[in-house]
Every structure is written in C-alpha cells, then in structure tokens.
Amino acid sequence: MIVDLPLRRIQQFARLGAKHQSSVLIRLHTKGGIVGIGESITPCGPWWSGDSVEAIQATINHYLAPLVVGEPALDASRIMAKLHGRVAGNAFAKAGIEMALLDAVGKIVDAPIHVLLGGRFRDRLSVAWPLATGDVNQEVDEAFRMLEAGKAGAFKLKMGALPLAQDLRRALAIAKELEGKASLRVDPNEAWDEPTTMRALAPLEAAGVEIIEQPVARWNLDAMARIHRQARSMLLIDEGVQSLHDASEVVKRAAAGLVSLKIMKTGGMRPARAMADIANAGGMHVYMGTFLETSIGTAANMQLAASIESLPYGGEVIGPLLIEEDLCEVPAVYKEHALWLPEGPGLGIRLDENQVRRFARASSQRIDRHSA
C-alpha cells in the first residue's frame, strides 16, 4: 500500500519542493508466521530517478511479487538475483523487497540485519541536517534548534534554486553564523554547470564549506573529475553513482572523494554495501544519504551504516525528523547529534498499525505477499 505522510516544513530541492512524503509499504509473510517489513520511497515523485510511488507499487504488484511468492525467504540472495534476471532496472522497487526479505531473515535467525551484512562497527551515525527553506534567518534558527536539541551536529544547505550570487550570499551568511559551532556542506542537486561550480568553489571554501555535493549533471563524470582536482573541499557524488558499475567508473576517473550511499538508488542494502567496498578500495570515503525515509527505511540505513568500517562524515539519514508522523511504534532515536542503531532482530522496528491505517492512501492496493 501507499502511505502519504505530512512533512514538518517544505523540503526545497534545486528544482522543486516537497510538502509531504509518500512511501510504498511492503509486508512479506512467511509460512512460519514471520512478517518482513520493507518500504520503497522517493522524494517528490519521479524527478530524481524517474520512479514514483505509483509506478513502484505497480511494478511490485504485477512483476516482482509473483517472482517472490513461494520462495524460501532464507534464499534472499538467490531471490534478488532472480528479480534482477527477470526485471531490468526498477532499483527502488527491488530495494523495498530486499528490505522486507532481510527483515524476515533477521527475524527467522534472531539477528539484526547488520549481522547478516558482516557485523557491527558502530551503534550510532553522526547526523547532518538539510537546510532547505531558502530563507537565511529561518535556516539559521533551524540549525541552532537542531544543535541545541542534539539532533544534528552538521548542516547541508540545499542550493541551486536561486541565482548563484544570491545562493552564495545565503551560504556565506549561514557559514558565518555556524563558524566554530558546526560544519556546513552544500548540495546544488545538479543545478550548476562546470564553470558555475568553478566560480563558486573559492567563496564556498573560504567560508569553510567542507563538502560540495553533486554540483553538475549526473552524467558528467569528466566535469566532476576536473572539479575534484580543483577543489579543496570534499566533492561528494550522489546522482552520478547509482550502480556498482557507476561506482567503478567514479573510482577509475577519480570523479569524487566521497560517495553517497542510498539503499533505494542501488536496489538494496547488499548492493549499497558492495558500493562502499568499491569506493573504499579506490581510496574514497562513503556517506549515508537520504531519500527522506520513514523510520522503516531509516532503520535499514542504520543497519547498513553499522556494518561499514569508515564513515568519517556520517550522513543525513533524517527522514523521521522531517516527517511529522511516524509508522513505527518506536520512532528512530536521535540524540547526541547522532542516529542510533535500533535493537532487535531484522530491522529492529515494529509497525504502528493505527498509523498505517490513518495515512494509507484510499486508492492504494495492499502489497501483502507470502513467501516460504
């Protein structure tokens, strides 16, 4: 089923803003009575990847779920290989199914998913909060509220929706207010071209901006490589690295210093974990990105993060802080400027069925499939 959840404020990206977040909720029932939970989620409809929750739901119902029904849940790797062999692309839909499978497997063997991914390196992840209203005063106030509440210790400014000169004034003003208190990163979401990015580097770096994320179009790895050679700030690639092949190309071309991991874009936790290994082998660090997941997907992100040795810049897994309502009995825990690993088998979460019913889209078809 699709659930539609309100946001606490508009989340402004370079090209559009989100007022709510929609998620495809997936339940996988085993013959032994275990229920695996997953979600597929994408912000603002199809602008980021071409996927929408409506298309994701249809793909799962008509093409992916029939390939899963009757299979042993413990054979999660083989099941996912089967899906990849029969259905091209559709990473977001596949990620939700893999999440439900791994949640079920974890519950069957009584172990959290990070154990299935190789074990735990950490129980918390430092959090960066997105500043995305476009108003400097509001953004500064929001940053200090998050700092004082212990929810986040770094901030990422969404850029690209305003003219460059105005955006730079905004960034420099916020950097000045945060100086000595918190670090600042910026994300133009592909809105700039290479010359614009080169013009922006000097003032941003002089202001102490530590990360610049995906300034140019996702396909332009050559430009990313040139920017990376020029920049003193860490260059983070996101839209430009969505598959394991993409990751190998980024390493080969030295097109960034930091790779954004997102479970949805890679098609699941296991391919995201493999992407981290490719990046690390190429001398790059990784970063936990977000698609504004609910506490379901946030738990999956934290299970993945727990299994990764080095995350020097943490991540921005902040969906439950921005989404006004939650689908879990115990929402994700944020304290000491970090997201904490949930306890328990699988994802470590339990659905709040009243909340699910409250926010379920009336026309949504339930995705409720049975495995072995």
Curated annotation (Swiss-Prot):
Recorded catalytic activity of this chain's protein: 2-[(2R)-2-chloro-2,5-dihydro-5-oxofuryl]acetate = 3-chloro-cis,cis-muconate + H(+)
Keyword set includes Isomerase: yes
One Pfam family linked to the record: MR_MLE_N
Required co-factors: Mn(2+)
Annotated binding of Mn(2+), by residue: D187, E213, D238
SMART domains: MR_MLE (SM00922)
Pathway: Aromatic compound metabolism; 3-chlorocatechol degradation
SUPFAM superfamilies: Enolase C-terminal domain-like (SSF51604), Enolase N-terminal domain-like (SSF54826)
Active site: K158 (proton acceptor), E316 (proton donor)
Alphabetical list of CDD domains matching this protein: MLE (cd03318)
EC number of the protein: 5.5.1.7
GO molecular function: chloromuconate cycloisomerase activity; manganese ion binding; muconate cycloisomerase activity
UniProt keyword list: Aromatic hydrocarbons catabolism, Isomerase, Manganese, Metal-binding, Plasmid
Keyword Phosphoprotein: no
Gene Ontology biological-process annotations: amino acid catabolic process
Enzyme class name: isomerase
Family listed: Belongs to the mandelate racemase/muconate lactonizing enzyme family.
Stored NCBIfam families: mucon_cyclo (TIGR02534)
Name recorded for this polypeptide: Chloromuconate cycloisomerase
Taxonomic source organism: Cupriavidus pinatubonensis (strain JMP 134 / LMG 1197) (Cupriavidus necator (strain JMP 134))
Gene: tfdDII
